Amino acid sequence: MEEFTLDRNSNVGNLIALAVLNKFDELARHGKPIIRANGVREWTTLAGVVIQKKMENEFICVCLATGVKCTPAGIIKNEQLGSVLHDCHAEILALRCFNRLLLEHCILIKESKKDTWLLEVADNGKFTLNSNLLIHLYVSECPCGDASMELLASRLENNKPWNLTVDSEKLMRGRADFGLLGIVRTKPGRPDAPVSWSKSCTDKLAAKQYLSILNSQTSLICEPIYLSCVVLYKKVIVKSAIDRAFGPFGRCAPLAEFGEKDNPYYFHPFTVLETDENFLYSRPLNQAEKTATSTNVLIWIGDKMQCTQVIHNGIKAGTKAKDVEKSQTLICRKSMMNLLHQLSQSLTNEKNYYEWKKLNIKRCQQKQILRNILKNWIPNGGNEFQWI
């Protein structure tokens, strides 16, 4: 098992962060936070996937996203399922963007019969990450959920002592009962927001240490790809919380017992690095400053795509949800399924998305192992739709 460390000395964290921050600065203003007419400054979270070329020690941002919103499946109309993005938190969107890029590279390899700088064809016929590459994730805020419980409590005006209970049999809202640690939480965290079964970013990132960062589409055609490092701004890190949420001796420790020779999935805890570099549009640490969350989401996918989209309420900005096809983003489930269909019709014969996901038996089995260990992981709704 790879040792988990919180490296406070290495400059790698700054190099990864700067790769994302510099790329964000290069993008056009549209979709970025603004200062509103009443003088209130908007804030958001930025996340980006950075590829490190080991031999050259080069760090390349290949995709990024901003966002802090989540749309519960229950308020999305049936005809819009698969077209609307549910989870618009930056780190989740950035990983969706990376999966879109992987699909594009798979198609390129199929058409050209040649490996790309990102992917190679393995002996078993699946695509695999180039052995010279490492994958990192930068996030400007501490991921919502268990990793940020102590940080959230420290920002409260009434910072009274709270009971440090380690387990619970309940599925908790993101900001409920700070004293309950090491448990699965949902987003949105606010008690006044509509209920969602979407898991916190902490839980989703923890899950990816076992299931890999591949999604339902790419996991069918690619060998698992794992994050090497997650980089966070140093002032949002509470080491004990990070260790508990992600570390090999925290709540994910039992996952180390799984993984066999014929099982491509195994527990791969990422290293958490800190950075001195702060994102210009981050939520201010000074609670006295009046701010508002940005309602826009911005995604950018680089490399061979070089494409930017602004997203509002889970669909392309400037479109209406009733215009189902026109409103679809590059990374919604229907878009990803159509791209996979372009790559392999034999893998996409089942048109019901829920039934199609169940056909990936190996991944479903590994998901159940993960849910049994993390506990209280109730599957999301919103999968009952025809993707084509």
Swiss-Prot record:
Keyword vocabulary terms for this entry: Cytoplasm, Hydrolase, Metal-binding, Nucleus, tRNA processing, Zinc
Binding site residues for 1D-myo-inositol hexakisphosphate: 96, 204, 357, 363
Cofactor(s), names only, from the UniProt record: 1D-myo-inositol hexakisphosphate; Zn(2+)
InterPro entries in the record: A_deamin, Tad1
Hydrolase keyword on record: yes
Keyword Transcription: no
GO annotation terms (biological process): tRNA modification; tRNA wobble adenosine to inosine editing
Domain A to I editase: 63-388
Sequence positions that bind Zn(2+): 89, 144, 201
Cofactor note: Binds 1 myo-inositol hexakisphosphate (IP6) per subunit.
GO molecular function: metal ion binding; RNA binding; tRNA-specific adenosine-37 deaminase activity
Active site feature: 91 (proton donor)
Gene Ontology cellular component annotations, sorted alphabetically: cytosol; nucleus
Catalytic activity: adenosine(37) in tRNA(Ala) + H2O + H(+) = inosine(37) in tRNA(Ala) + NH4(+)
Family named by the database record: Belongs to the ADAT1 family.
Function summary: Deaminates adenosine-37 to inosine in tRNA-Ala.
Official protein name in the record: tRNA-specific adenosine deaminase 1
Native organism taxonomy: Eukaryota, Fungi, Dikarya, Ascomycota, Taphrinomycotina
